């Protein structure tokens, strides 16, 4: 069994990597992928904590997080596809100059 500290450290490292990718990248697709990494890191923390305390709540929260991530990814990819069809770019600087 993996110690609680090791699992939480791994989850924290994954979360920081996702946050770094979200803040540094200028491509909306890579920003969406970084957000998915952050959601999975939080879900991993739930599973590790639930496993440590012998509760099934961690796995239930993981299933909920996966469902949320799937919905977020499908809506985000649909929006990105439409944005790419209209603007022919996914660069955040170009997209932020859109007129209303």
UniProtKB/Swiss-Prot annotation:
It is a multi-pass membrane protein. Its EC number is 7.1.1.-. GO terms for biological process: ATP synthesis coupled electron transport. It is found in: Cell inner membrane. One of its GO terms (molecular function) is quinone binding. It catalyses: a quinone + NADH + 5 H(+)(in) = a quinol + NAD(+) + 4 H(+)(out). InterPro entries: NADH_UbQ_OxRdtase_chain4L/K, NUOK/Mnh_C1-like. NDH-1 is composed of 13 different subunits. Subunits NuoA, H, J, K, L, M, N constitute the membrane sector of the complex. This is NADH-quinone oxidoreductase subunit K. The lineage of its organism: Bacteria, Pseudomonadati, Pseudomonadota, Gammaproteobacteria, Enterobacterales. The gene is nuoK.
């Amino acid at each position: 069994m993996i110690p609680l500290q090791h699992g939480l450290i791994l989850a924290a490292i994954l979360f920081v990597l996702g946050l770094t990718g979200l803040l540094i990248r200028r491509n909306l697709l890579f920003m969406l992928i970084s957000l998915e990494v952050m959601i999975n890191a939080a879900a991993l923390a739930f599973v590790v904590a639930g496993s440590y305390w012998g509760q099934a709540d961690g796995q239930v929260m993981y299933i909920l997080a996966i469902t949320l991530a799937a919905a977020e990814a499908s809506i985000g990819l649909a929006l990105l596809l439409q944005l790419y069809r209209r603007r022919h770019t996914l660069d955040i600087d170009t997209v932020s100059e859109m007129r209303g």
